[in-house]
Every structure is written in C-alpha cells, then in structure tokens.
C-alpha cells in the first residue's frame, strides 16, 4: 500500500486533496457522507470506500479533512473500536483547536496508528505541488516521513513542526485570531467613515496592512456583499466558525477569553441576521443597524 492514500471528507478542500493525489499517480481511496461527492471523484479515478473505517484501513496514509473534530472522530468510530490503525499514519487536516488535536491523536495512537495534525494555509483552488502557501504539520516524527510524499502534493512549502501535535492548530488559530479581529476592525472603520461622509475607497488605499483588508473595504464601499462577486474569500458563516474555534481555545487554555467571546458573539449575530452566505465584510451591516 506504499503508493496508496485515503482521503476522508470531500468538501471543497478534501476534494482538492484527493485530486492532488490522483494527479501525482497515487492510488486514492475516498469516503464522504454525501455519496454524490464520492461518485464525482470515482469518475476521476479514485476508489470508493464504503465507510470511513474502510477508507482508513485501505492505505498506510490517511488524510482526514472534515468540518469538525467531532465529525472526524465519528467517521472513524469503528476503527476506534477494533484498533485497526496499526502501521497507518492518520493526518488530521481539518480546523481544530490544540485540545482537539491532542484528543484525536490520542485515539489514533490508542488504535495503533501514528498521528499528525496539520493546517493548510490556502484556499482549495491553490492546492498542488507548485503551491507556495505553507502547510504546517506536527506530530509523530516517523509518521511525518511516511506521509511526506503525499503531503508534498498539497504544497511545495511543507513545514515540519516536529513532535508537537498541537502546534499546527495553535499557529493556525493564532493567524485566524488576527484575521477575525481585523475584519471586525474593518467593518468598524468603514462605518466610522460612512457616518462622517469620508471616502471608504481612500481608506482602503491608506490601509496597507492586514489580511486582505483593502479588498473588504472596497466590498463595503460598493455594497458588493455577494460571496466572490468582487473578490474571493470565505463567507461570514465560515469566519463565525473560526471565531468560535478561537474562543474555545482561549477557554481551554485558561487565558482571558473576553475578546474572542465578544468577537464570536458579534460574528454569530451577523449570521443569525441572515448574512452567513455573504462575504465577511457584511459584518458592517450589523453596525449599520
């Protein structure tokens, strides 16, 4: 099974991971709760697994990319019961908190496998060996070397974080924490300028820092909130989930969670107001009242 890999979860990122493996000539097993997504990949050359457990048993390297850690653990429920992961490397590539990374890794190791936790720092359409965006991976050192040929198909910028299974989640959440705070700041700054009749597009030109802040200003200035209508990016609902992860990590680590609690509530209010499918810049609509 040295040239085989399994991909569990075929959302936008999971499907991109599977296609990258297929492009590299790897025998690729796939599983997803929604069968049409499996059928699409099978038509492209993948092999369907009937269950998540079957996918985990089909290859020595297993890439897990689902929406939550709870979903990931549920997908492999039968494997946890029969301890069938001996000789396998399981790489958790969904968004997790450090505590969740440790929990998932403990289950993998108890079932006889080697555990890695990773963070992919790009959108699905950039996945591939020519991608320069970082992919950070930590955990079992021997497992990393086994998984390396498959991980290199995700990005040419593979960062080995050593044996710290929680490092990728911590770094990922650290970057995401700056992002969710900045997007809230953009909305506030835009509303401030609106109230005073100042030019938001000029503010965008003046702003040279932060993750894509100028684009969010322009979206607000042009009321172009439909997702990807002006610039690509994550939906407000996706960023609301990010805020929840950052809040959970602060509480888990016992650090002051006042700011992430506020931000999580702020983002969730925007989702509850019906803006979840719009660009994250739609946060300004909550401030507009």
Residue ranges and their predicted role:
Residues 1-64, 88-89, 124, 195:
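NAD(P)+-binding Rossmann beta1-loop-alpha1 motif at the extreme N-terminus of oxidoreductases
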